[in-house]
Amino acid sequence: MPKMKTHRASAKRFKRTANGGLKRHHAFTGHRFHGKTKKQRRHLRKPAMVSRSDMKRIKQMVAQMH
C-alpha cells in the first residue's frame, strides 16, 4: 500500500503543539470588522485549539506534518 499523502491545504492551516494538539485560526477575521466589537476582534486574533471531535479527521489529513 502506498504512503498516505499529507493534505497540503490542511497542513498550511494547522500547527501541531508540543502535547500533540492542533492550533487553528478563528473564522470571521477576513473583513467587515465594523460590525464586531473591540472585544470580539481582540479574541479572534488569538489562536484556538481544534476540538476533540475533529481531531481524528484532521490528524489523518496532516499525518506527515511535523
UniProtKB/Swiss-Prot annotation:
Region (Disordered): 1-52
GO molecular function per UniProt: structural constituent of ribosome
UniProt keyword terms in alphabetical order: Ribonucleoprotein, Ribosomal protein
Matching Gene3D superfamilies: 4.10.410.60
Cellular component GO terms held in the UniProt record: cytosolic large ribosomal subunit
Pfam families the UniProt entry points to: Ribosomal_L35p (PF01632)
Coiled-coil regions listed: none
Record's compositionally biased regions (Basic residues): 1-46
UniProt cross-references to InterPro entries, sorted A to Z: Ribosomal_bL35 (IPR001706), Ribosomal_bL35-like (IPR021137), Ribosomal_bL35_CS (IPR018265), Ribosomal_bL35_sf (IPR037229)
Residues annotated as signal peptide: none
One GO process term, biological-process aspect: translation
Family to which the UniProt record says this protein belongs: Belongs to the bacterial ribosomal protein bL35 family.
PANTHER family in the cross-refs: 54S RIBOSOMAL PROTEIN BL35M (PTHR33343), LARGE RIBOSOMAL SUBUNIT PROTEIN BL35M (PTHR33343:SF1)
Protein name, as recorded: Large ribosomal subunit protein bL35
